[in-house]
């Protein structure tokens, strides 16, 4: 929910609600001018999304009514993944920031010609006719997920809202896909719902999808793209790091994915 006012006015209600609903974690997004208020109420800053509020940073604070939820069980592994990402050459991402990318729209035939995908692969925006196959792929890829991507109707509904879906096909069969949840008011977009089938991983599909989403977002005058990705998954973290995204924090036990709650890394990039 959105709240305008002093955080202390709502902190008690949030704590009571968490107790009633047996919530293990309370998450608060706040602009820079309000960032000290959650701290005075016992909240801890876990990360930042750069330029989230139409150019202003967003500070993410958390409180853990359930103390066990605060424990990161794979911290050492996740720290190693980030260390490896930051150690690798990020020159490509830096160069991309310096370049003035044309905002002119081109057709998808031209984009296909410039694609780095191997022969037989096609990258394109998803359409309504893809929803059934997309839902099936998501249901196979995630045992648990924060949103019902396994439902065709849900995907169709989000297609009509502020969600862009892009996919990679191999001879007409979807092998990789991702989306961008757009916030037009604040001109930010979250790149999410990233999935590649096991036999196609490591071939660079996700990087191409991210690039395509970024291009579309830039053409729509969005300021920033960011992601909250699984902290224990090396591939997806490496993909965002190699594209010039900055690591800006980790949200502990934040999302139900796979077998339970997982830590999520924050990566941000100006468009």
UniProtKB/Swiss-Prot annotation:
It holds the Pfam family Acetyltransf_1. Belongs to the acetyltransferase family. It catalyses: (3S)-3,6-diaminohexanoate + acetyl-CoA = (3S)-6-acetamido-3-aminohexanoate + CoA + H(+). Catalyzes the acetylation of beta-lysine to N6-acetyl-beta-lysine, a compatible solute produced by methanogenic archaea that helps cells to cope with salt stress. The keyword Acyltransferase applies. The keyword Secreted does not apply. It comes from the Archaea. Residues 121-269 form the N-acetyltransferase domain. Keywords: Acyltransferase, Transferase. Induction: Transcription is induced at high salt concentrations. Forms part of an operon with ablA. This is Beta-lysine N(6)-acetyltransferase. GO terms for molecular function: N-acetyltransferase activity. Residues 86-122 are annotated as: Disordered. Residues 95-114 have a biased composition (Basic residues). Its EC number is 2.3.1.264. SUPFAM superfamilies: Acyl-CoA N-acyltransferases (Nat).
């Amino acid at each position: 929910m959105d709240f305008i006012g002093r955080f202390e006015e709502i902190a008690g209600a949030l704590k009571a609600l968490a107790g009633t609903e047996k919530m293990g974690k309370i998450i608060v997004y706040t602009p820079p001018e309000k960032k000290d208020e959650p701290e005075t109420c016992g909240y801890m800053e876990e990360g930042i999304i750069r330029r989230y509020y139409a150019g202003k940073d967003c500070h993410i604070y958390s409180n853990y009514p359930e103390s066990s939820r605060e424990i990161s069980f794979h911290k050492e592994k996740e720290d190693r993944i980030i260390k490896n990402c930051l150690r690798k050459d990020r020159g490509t991402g830096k160069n991309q920031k310096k370049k003035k990318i044309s905002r002119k729209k081109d057709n998808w035939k031209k984009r296909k010609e410039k694609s780095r995908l191997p022969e037989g692969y096609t990258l394109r925006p998803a359409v309504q006719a893809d929803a059934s196959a997309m839902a099936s792929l998501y249901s196979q890829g995630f045992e648990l997920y924060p949103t019902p991507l396994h439902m065709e109707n849900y995907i169709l509904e989000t297609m009509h809202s502020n969600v862009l879906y892009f996919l990679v096909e191999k001879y007409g069969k979807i092998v990789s896909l991702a989306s961008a949840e757009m916030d037009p008011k604040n001109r930010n977009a979250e790149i999410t719902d990233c999935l590649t089938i096991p036999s196609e991983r490591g071939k660079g599909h996700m990087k191409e999808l991210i690039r395509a989403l970024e291009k579309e977002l830039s053409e729509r005058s969005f300021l920033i793209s960011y992601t909250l990705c699984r902290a224990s998954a090396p591939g997806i973290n490496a993909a965002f790091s190699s594209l010039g995204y900055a690591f800006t924090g980790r949200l502990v036990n934040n999302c139900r994915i796979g077998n339970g709650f997982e830590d999520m890394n924050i990566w941000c990039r100006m468009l």
